[in-house]
Amino acid sequence: MTETLRLTPAGLTLADLRRVLAGPVRLEIAPRDLEAAEASARTVAEVIGSGRTVYGINTGFGLLARTRIEPDRLAQLQRNLVLSHAAGTGEAMPDRVVRLMLVLKVASLLRGFSGVRGEVIRALAALVSAEALPLVPAKGSVGASGDLAPLAHLVLPLLGLGQVRLAGRTVPAADGLAAAGLRPLELGPKEGLALLNGTQASTALALAGLVAAEWAFDAALVAGALSIDAAQGSDTPFDARIHALRGQRGQIDAAAGYRRLLAGSPIRASHLSCARVQDPYCLRCQPQVMGACLDQLRFAAGTLATEANAVTDNPLVFPDDGDILSGGNFHAEPVAMAADQIALALAEIGSLSERRTAMLVDPHHNGGLPAFLVTDGGLNSGFMIAQVTAAALASENKGLAHPASVDSIPTSANQEDHVSMATWAARRLLEMADNAAGIVAVELLAACQGIDFRRPLRTSAPLEAVHAAVREEVGFYDRDRHFAPDIEAARGLIAAGRAASGTDWLAAA
């Protein structure tokens, strides 16, 4: 059943954004919540009636801003803007990201500072409710002046042009409009610019990456706890007193997560008096590394939740004062930097997970487990190449984690001479999260294999539940077999939340 999301000005929460990414929603907007938007549209009409020249309303754009456009050509100006700016390329963005882009654009316009009529806002909302999602090429934005090309493709169907995704098929825009009960619109003054200008593409991509990163973080924390018991590691490094002395919030919370997962483990109780004094960093320093990653994800979540409710087009209309002001809210630097933070966290989450897998397959460091976690080594190779796969994915993410926000390239004849690269910064996150999930999937299998070698001893109750879920899908490795399907099965468990800690890590963001 499709959920209903009631949109109000500046009312989107992180929970709402997750819901939009999770599946179809029906948008509901109360008539009173369109009043501010209608007031801003009236202000635009008054400016035109007064004969004033105002950028974006009766002028050209970018370097052509000094060109005045006559009143009888203003509708054509807005149409031309959408057509000329729909110049993206590459594969289409995922449907869930496009759905969120539409919701973010509606939320921004509802604030009432963009000069867009309620009719246009309702049309965008109708596309969401009908799950008629515009086909938006993923490449073509530098994150200033806004996400112009992606947003042009997003609104192209309102003119009856372009394509939409409908019931899993790509169809002409006319079919999507019909499904939403709409007809092609003629855009009014400034409306094309308001629809195209903004950070909604990069923000939607970054939010999708954030949610995927949270899943990867949580699964890595669970797999890391399993690896501790598989390698007969110590839980002493997770003592709350250690982390309280440092005072880093993410570290404190991560350590608490490990304590909850490991509490009551018979494996741990079996080796309390062993001679090993310290574990490798990949086990011992998990709260420090994962906690720092958590802090980055939480900070990024706060930035993106703010941006989701922001007004980021230009110029901005202030109906109470009758002013229309040009600024730079379209510059997506906050989104770019938030995406860079998520990328760094994803790279480190995967890097640490891969190191734990490498430790588990190494007979010199894994607490007495067989080499590559398989008996009859030599005849069997066990987890040898699965660990190499994890290493390959970890190295890919290291390259992808290079900060995008430090890059800039001038555009529009040097009028737009510094850009954020936010869309690329955000777009790579889904690939990085997918890589991280693959790395953690390998560790999850390796850790469960290590736990089996500790039988009849058992791990803690929550970790035994995860082990059981894995073994429902993937059997014990008593000999070599085709490995790739098992990695995909473990990835499926992670995606389904069956290897989760049950903690909402971003709740306090």
Curated annotation (Swiss-Prot):
One of its GO terms (cellular component) is cytoplasm. It is found in: Cytoplasm. Pathway: Amino-acid degradation; L-histidine degradation into L-glutamate; N-formimidoyl-L-glutamate from L-histidine: step 1/3. The keyword Acyltransferase does not apply. One of its GO terms (biological process) is L-histidine catabolic process to glutamate and formamide. Its EC number is 4.3.1.3. Contains an active site 4-methylidene-imidazol-5-one (MIO), which is formed autocatalytically by cyclization and dehydration of residues Ala-Ser-Gly. One of its GO terms (molecular function) is histidine ammonia-lyase activity. It comes from the Bacteria. InterPro entries: Aromatic_Lyase, Fumarase/histidase_N, HutH, L-Aspartase-like, Phe/His_NH3-lyase_AS. Its main location: cytoplasm. CDD domains: PAL-HAL. Keywords: Cytoplasm, Histidine metabolism, Lyase. There is a cross-link at residues 144-146 (5-imidazolinone (Ala-Gly)). The modification 2,3-didehydroalanine (Ser) is found at residue 145. It is an enzyme of class 4 (lyase). It catalyses: L-histidine = trans-urocanate + NH4(+). HAMAP family: His_ammonia_lyase. Belongs to the PAL/histidase family. This is Histidine ammonia-lyase. It comes from Rhodospirillum centenum (strain ATCC 51521 / SW). The gene is hutH.
